[in-house]
From Swiss-Prot:
Residues forming coiled coils: none
A Pfam entry, by short name: adh_short_C2
Organism in which the protein naturally occurs: Davidiella tassiana
Protein name, entry field: NADP-dependent mannitol dehydrogenase
Lineage, uppermost ranks: Eukaryota, Fungi, Dikarya, Ascomycota, Pezizomycotina
E.C. code: 1.1.1.138
Active site (catalytic residues): S160 (proton donor), Y175 (proton acceptor), K179 (lowers pka of active site tyr)
């Protein structure tokens, strides 16, 4: 018999509460990215939060101070290179040692692409796939053992609408392929981990995080014209989705992918 049970809470507020839970968010060292907004959302709902950085230690520490001061929760930053399984394995061990458990893991760290396969190098392709796809696998494998041992857990993968469509006019095949893999990884793991954990993905569209600032303005204007809502999304508009998947409000949701793209993929 499957081991995962329905929430015991009747109140929606209680279902969405993350009090007593520990949430890990990778890639949360920036001031306005999806990672820190996911961490803010979880902290606002009462979770203790562990965030990671690859190189921006100062940014991560500043975010930790903000989370603790604003929400009155325990927070800590960890260095983690998701392209290394050993680094992800160490992260899980360190968080469990410091917090006692992990209830939800948001695999958010990623890399962007700036060329197609003919103009780009083999090294550039391998970097994007290693970080975005294999990095997500490393996080999943590392925390999956902990979830199985506890008999409960929620893995939330930051995928992308680019895993559903081929972006135009910018060329980023490596990124599209990696994110499509993340979406199917979530579906596959939802089945593989059906007895002890839920796995879902979130596919954001164009979100104003600063990572696309290198894209020419005329290109950005073109893609805005292709979005029914006519603008980039804000990272804070994703907080509710991350909280939902991390919380007991989603105890019957697994293998799902939530598109949050301003309607881009409807066209």
């Amino acid at each position: 018999m499957p081991g995962q049970q329905a929430t015991k809470h009747e109140s929606l507020l209680d279902q969405l509460s993350l009090k007593g839970k520990v949430v890990v968010v990778t890639g949360a060292s920036g001031p306005k990215g999806m990672g820190i907004e996911a961490a803010r959302g979880c902290a606002e709902m009462g979770a203790a939060v562990a965030i990671t950085y690859a190189s921006r230690a100062q940014g991560a520490e500043e975010n930790v101070k903000e989370l603790e001061k604003t929400y009155g929760i325990k927070a800590k930053a960890y260095k983690c290179q998701v392209d290394s399984y050993e680094s992800c394995e160490k992260l899980v061990k360190d968080v469990v040692a410091d917090f006692g458990q992990i209830d939800a893991f948001i695999a958010n760290a990623g890399a962007t692409a700036d060329s197609g396969i003919l103009d780009g190098s083999v090294e550039a392709w391998n970097h994007v796939v290693q970080v975005d796809l294999n990095g997500t696998f490393h996080c999943a494998k590392a925390v999956g053992h902990h979830f199985k041992e506890r008999g409960t857990g929620s893995l939330v993968i930051t995928a992308s609408m680019s895993g559903h469509i081929a972006n135009f006019p910018q060329e980023q095949t490596s990124y599209n392929v990696a994110k499509a893999g993340c979406i199917h990884m979530a579906r596959s793991l939802a089945n593989e981990w059906r007895d002890f954990a839920r796995v879902n993905s979130i596919s954001p569209g164009y979100i104003d995080t600063g990572l696309s600032d290198f894209v020419p303005k005329e290109t950005q204007q073109l893609w805005h014209s292709m979005i029914p809502m006519g603008r980039d999304g804000l990272a804070k508009e994703l907080k509710g989705a991350y909280v939902y998947f991390a919380s007991d409000a989603s105890t019957y949701t697994t293998g799902a992918d939530l598109l949050i793209d301003g309607g881009y993929t409807t066209r």
